[in-house]
């Protein structure tokens, strides 16, 4: 055993291991980098798939909102039925009611204002009422054609939007982008999936090959160090020398194999890189179509906001009409109460007139009784004077004995009610 040979073995093993470590480290870094790119691409495909699935659901949701929320509930039930039919009919009804009541009041003569001396036209009950809010509903009904035109315009926009969402967005763009995704990246394209998995398996196998080579070179280097340390007995050392000597002869072939493995690594990385580049380009193109679809959704959102603004305007008109209907109802009720109270007032005037007549009758009867009593009193006075006047001096009851003035004074007035 030559110690110079041992030293040579150690140096050869160290150099080979060091060179191999540099090559393997560089190769492993490239493998890690391309695997990261592969993982990133696979993750981006999953995200793109999630986005497309989400957009399809959003498309269905948008279509449901348009058909049921806007088409059925808003346009048909709220606008066409509740506003243009029910509300308009109610306004027409109450406008007719209040107009009829005003016309009725205009035709009722105020009996209390009639005078025999007055030859002018008598006043009517309609002269005593306020007419400020009589035509509230007529004014609102004049606005209905404008509302009808707005609803008709929004219906045309709605129908156009439904057609675009259903035909262009859902049936065409979303369906097309879904089919393209499935064709290029989905389960329908097993070849593409298998290619990516095959690249990944090849790289994993090459990593194992590199690890085995490095493990073999490391073990050989450890044996040379053990041989150099001389800590084993001569027989074992002699046997170890033969093993190391044989392995040293294989270093060239092992290093050659390492280069071949690294060449395979480089080829696989190159092929995988080209594959990813092509797939990323396809994904980018598909993502551009998805972005265009998202822009379509944003435009549809703006249209929905327009529907909301129009709905708010119509709701405001509806609420205003409802308030005017309530005002008109209250005014109709007031006119009814006014007419009823006028009727009661006529009865009250008649009652007062009857009372005045009764008072006049009573007073005339009283006056007649007083006159009779006064005549009787005059006769009694004359008889008294005739019998007693000669004997009574004037001073005994000054100014009274021969006073024939009436004992009563009656002055009354009954007002004409």
Swiss-Prot record:
It holds the Pfam family ATG17_like. It is a peripheral membrane protein. The keyword Transmembrane does not apply. It is found in: Cytoplasm; Preautophagosomal structure membrane. GO terms for molecular function: molecular adaptor activity; protein kinase activator activity. The keyword Cytoplasm applies. Keywords: Autophagy, Coiled coil, Cytoplasm, Membrane. Forms a complex with ATG13, ATG29 and CIS1/ATG31. The ATG17-ATG29-ATG31 complex interacts with the ATG1-ATG13 complex. Forms a complex with SNX4 and ATG20. Interacts with ATG11 and the conserved oligomeric Golgi (COG) complex subunits COG1, COG3 and COG4. Belongs to the ATG17 family. Autophagy-specific protein that functions with ATG13, ATG29, and CIS1/ATG31 in response to autophagy-inducing signals as a scaffold to recruit other ATG proteins to organize pre-autophagosomal structure (PAS) formation. Modulates the timing and magnitude of the autophagy response, such as the size of the sequestering vesicles, through interacting with and regulating ATG1 kinase activity. Plays particularly a role in pexophagy and nucleophagy. With ATG13, is required for ATG1 activation by autophosphorylation of 'Thr-226'. Recruits ATG9 to the pre-autophagosomal structure. This is Autophagy-related protein 17. The lineage of its organism: Eukaryota, Fungi, Dikarya, Ascomycota, Saccharomycotina.
